[in-house]
Every structure is written in C-alpha cells, then in structure tokens.
Amino acid sequence: MKILNCFSLIGQCAKPILRTYTSPAADLLKLPRVDIKEGKLRYLLLSVYIHGETKHARTVVRGWNTDSHDDIYYKNVRAMEKLGLCTKCLGGGKMDNDESARKIKIHGSCKTFGAANHHKTKEILLSSSKYKNFNITVKK
C-alpha cells in the first residue's frame, strides 16, 4: 500500500511539470503562421520559439495598418509571453493586400528591424490556406 501511495505522489508531482513543458510546445504548434489585415500595411517576419529551443522555432508573418513596426512587434511579444513563448524579429517591410483582387505586393523595409526576407514571407503566405491562390509579388 505504501508503494501505491508513493506512485500516487509521484504522479501528482509530475502533472504540473508535464503541463509546464507541453503547454508552450502545443501553443507553438497551434500558432497561426499568418495574421495580416487588408489594405496597405506594415508587416514583420517573426521567429517564435520556446525559451532556449531556437532550433524548433516557427516563422510567422504579422501585419496591420499601423504607424510603426514597433507596435506590431510589442503587441506580438506580449501575446507570445502570455503563452510562454519567445519572439525574435527577422525584419519587416510593407504590403499592399488587395483581397478582392487576390493580390499582395511585398516591398520596402523597416527602419527599426531592417528588411525582412520578402521571398520567405511570400513562401509563408502561399503555404496558408487563405492566401495560397493569391498573386503575390515581391518588389526589390
């Protein structure tokens, strides 16, 4: 009986530990790769990862109609921290997203974070179900 009680205590101790380590991983996998709005917008290419696990990062695109790339970055940092995830900016740029014409133009750079790899951004957009049939062009 003492052995069973001992195993029960081990199980109770292990549950919070497992929950701690699996929750950020699950959140990282559920994280949408693309979150952009319609119209002329600024965007960032972000690497999201579990602290200390940069090898298993997920690259995401985030873009909104805002005056500054910083607004996008800090809003995403706060959201990812709530999930136990870390964020690193890979650069930014601008987009013209015309959803009615199914066209997206990617161009420009970000003064704060530098230019994003627009071809990587295009690849991520085309991999999403919403934008896979869009005509996406990259300006130099």
Curated annotation (Swiss-Prot):
Substrate binds at residues 42, 110-112. Keywords: Differentiation, Sexual differentiation. The keyword GTP-binding does not apply. GO terms for cellular component: cytosol. It holds the Pfam family Ocnus. GO terms for molecular function: protein histidine phosphatase activity. Disulfide bonds: none annotated. The keyword S-adenosyl-L-methionine does not apply. InterPro entries: Janus, Janus_sf. The active site is at 69 (proton acceptor). Belongs to the janus family. JanA and janB regulate somatic sex differentiation. This is Sex-regulated protein janus-B.
